[in-house]
Every structure is written in C-alpha cells, then in structure tokens.
C-alpha cells in the first residue's frame, strides 16, 4: 500500500513538469456582442436532431421528408410534375486510355441542358454489368472536363493531374462506368450571370438569390439534376444499379452529401473536403453561400445529414492543411457519425480519413474504401 502511495505522489510531481495541453484554437474570432449573437441565432430548433433512444427507421423517414421540403426539392417536384427529361448522346471518342469518352446532355427541366461525360471501359460487355461512379464537381468552371480527364490544354492537364483531380478517369480505368456531370451554377456551361455585379460578381451567389425567390435552393436544383441522371443510369444496360458510388470535391462533395442523404440509390458516398458541421462553435459558416439551405439549423446539422446515409457506406475525406475547414470540428462530427451508424446497425460503414495536403481529392484514401464497400455488396 505504501509503495502505491509513493508511486502516485511521484506521478503527480512528474505531471507538474509536463507542458500544459493547449486547447484547440478557435477557427475564427468575432467581436462581442456579435459573437454571442451569431451563436444564439444560429443554434436553431434542431427539430430532427438524432436521438439514440428514438426508432431509427422512423427518425430517418421523418427527417428525410422534412429535408426534401426544406431544400425546395418538394417544390421542384410539384413545379415539374409531368416533365420528361431527355438525354442526348454525343459522339463517342476513343482515347489512348482504357475507356471511351462521350459528351452527352440531359434536359432536366424546360430549357435546362446539363452536359455530362459518359466514360465506358473499352472491355465493357452486355453480359456483365459494371459499377457506376457519379461525380459532380465543385467551384471549377471546367469541372466536368477536369473530372473526366478531357483537358482543354496542357496547363489544365498539369493543374488537374497535379492534384489527382481526374477522379472520373481514374474510376473508368478501374472498370467503372462514369457519369461526370456539370454542376448548376458552377460549371462554365451553367453559370447564372450577374450583369450589374449586384451579387458580388459571383454566379453561384446569383443562382442562390434567384432560387430563393422561386421557393427552391441551388442544392435542390443540383440534387434534382443528379436524380434525373440516376433515373437514366438505372435503365442503362451496362450499369449495375446496386453498385452506385458518388463522390465530388468541395461543392461537389456537398452535392454528394445531400444527394446521398435524400436518394437511397447511392450505395457508397465519398464527399471530399466538404463534410463538416454547418458552422464552427464561434458561428463561422463553413460552406459557400450557394450551399445554403435556409432554416437548416431548425432541422438539424450535418451529423443528421450523414445519419440519413446510414447504414449505407459513407467516407469523409479531408486534407490536414485545408484552410477552409477546421479539424477539431470535423473530428467531432466523425465521432458523432460513428454513434449514429452504430444505432443503424452498421458502425463500420462510416470512416473519416485525413490526407496529407489541402483542398483536393485523396484517391489513396478513397479507392480502398470503395473497393471494400462494393465487395460487401457482392457477398
């Protein structure tokens, strides 16, 4: 007993010499009373906050229905009832790679043509269906071309490959069929002009303002476009509709998160450099204006968004030097998602990985997760 006491005292004295652990630094700082005001008004009612004691299936159903309403997607469904999307297939172009590349388009609402690349492995056969990768881009006006490896010039090629950003081309080499679509308000082909620079000369913000006036959001428009592509893909003879993977970086990751939360046809989701809470504890809002869903904090937060993906597969990927996001906030969210997935009965179907650089794709983190998830589906 005496020995134990001596050892305890020694340990206490030793700890006195250890440097104090620093508390995580705030992501930003607001002056008072602004800081308190922001955190107070942004707290929200959290009406669909996850509760482990609730029935998981019922919680998901009600939370998903409310999210569809909140984004304005329900409004779009009403406004566009009876409209039939039309797909136009372009001329297939052979590449020096192991796949063909075809620039196509889909009319998702009257007069709105969404261009997309369709990548098909050259060895694809009608006797065997292949998994699909749907990969919408973020704030890159050449985004669909970047992801599909359809480079405009050498400078574009070097920029994309320097960050391993040709994620669609990578997937096609791995035997995936790929749909790399333009993202509304972000692709050069689908920008909303800001003629008088009233919206800061930012096309994505102009899109937000116009959408809000019509009872929808850019998120709703973008999810709508992805769903119409999924409708078409499900009927494609070469696509295995039970093995659909979705990914995108930055704004493309935000779109991946919302689409997967709303549409259960996505089996594996990898939102890159995007999946985080709505705001930091100081009140800083992490995502671009165009990702805004009004009253989202009255609904819940991104942990609930991730909870709508469960028990399907969800990998969060971030870069350690990405200045747009806050590691302590992301790490906390990762732990919260583990608990939600545990409640769904699939604790191992979500993970958080950190890449060693900034705001970009991390294929070395993504592909092992995808392969493992799809292998499970085949068992």
Language-model segment annotations:
Residues 20-100, 108, 379:
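N-terminal targeting or regulatory segments adjacent to alpha/beta-hydrolase or S9 domains
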Residues 205-206, 210-214, 228, 266-307, ...:
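Mobile cap/lid helix-loop segments that gate and shape the active-site cleft of serine hydrolases
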Residues 335-379:
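C-terminal catalytic histidine-bearing segment of alpha/beta-hydrolase fold enzymes
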Residues 248-258:
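Glycine-rich nucleophile elbow surrounding the catalytic serine of serine-hydrolase chemistry
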Residues 238-250:
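Alpha/beta-hydrolase fold nucleophile elbow
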Residues 128, 134-227, 234-235, 280-285:
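Cap/lid segment of the alpha/beta-hydrolase catalytic domain
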Residues 309, 316-318:
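Short beta-strand/loop motif that positions the catalytic acidic residue
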Residues 91-152:
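Glycine-rich active-site/cofactor-binding loop and its immediate structural neighborhood
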């Amino acid at each position: 007993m005496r020995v134990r006491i001596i050892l305890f005292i020694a340990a206490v004295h030793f700890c006195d010499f250890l440097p104090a652990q620093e508390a995580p630094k705030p992501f930003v700082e607001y002056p008072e009373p602004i800081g308190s005001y922001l955190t107070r008004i942004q707290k929200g009612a959290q009406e669909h906050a996850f509760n482990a004691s609730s029935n998981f299936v019922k919680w998901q159903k009600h939370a998903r229905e409310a999210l569809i309403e909140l984004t304005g997607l329900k409004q779009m469904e009403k406004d566009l009832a009876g409209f039939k999307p039309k797909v136009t297939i372009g001329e297939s172009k052979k590449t020096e790679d192991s796949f063909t590349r075809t620039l196509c388009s889909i009319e998702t609402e009257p007069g709105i043509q969404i261009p997309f690349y369709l990548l098909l492995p050259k060895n694809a056969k009608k006797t065997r269906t292949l998994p699909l990768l749907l990969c919408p881009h973020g704030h890159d006006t050449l985004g669909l071309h970047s992801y599909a490896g359809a480079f405009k010039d050498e400078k574009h090629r070097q920029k994309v490959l320097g960050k391993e950003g040709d994620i669609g081309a990578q997937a096609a080499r791995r035997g995936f069929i790929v749909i790399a679509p333009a993202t509304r308000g972000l692709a050069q082909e689908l920008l909303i002009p800001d003629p008088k620079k009233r919206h800061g000369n930012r096309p994505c913000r102009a899109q937000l303002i116009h959408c809000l006036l019509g009872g929808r959001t850019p998120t709703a428009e973008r999810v709508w476009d992805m769903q119409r592509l999924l409708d078409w893909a499900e009927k494609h003879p070469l696509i295995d509709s039970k093995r659909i993977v979705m990914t995108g970086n930055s704004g493309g990751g935000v779109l991946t998160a919302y689409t997967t939360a709303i549409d259960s046809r996505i089996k594996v989701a990898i939102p890159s450099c995007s999946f985080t809470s709505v705001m930091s504890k100081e009140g800083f809002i992490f995502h671009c204006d165009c990702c805004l869903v009004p009253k989202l904090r009255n609904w819940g937060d991104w942990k609930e968004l991730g909870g709508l993906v469960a028990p399907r597969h969800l990998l969060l990927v971030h870069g350690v030097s990405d200045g747009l996001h806050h590691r302590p906030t992301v790490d906390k969210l990762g732990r919260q998602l583990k608990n939600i997935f545990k409640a769904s009965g699939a604790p191992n179907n979500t993970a958080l990985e950190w890449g060693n650089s900034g705001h970009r794709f991390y294929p070395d983190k993504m592909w092992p997760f995808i392969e493992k998830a799809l292998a499970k589906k085949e068992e």
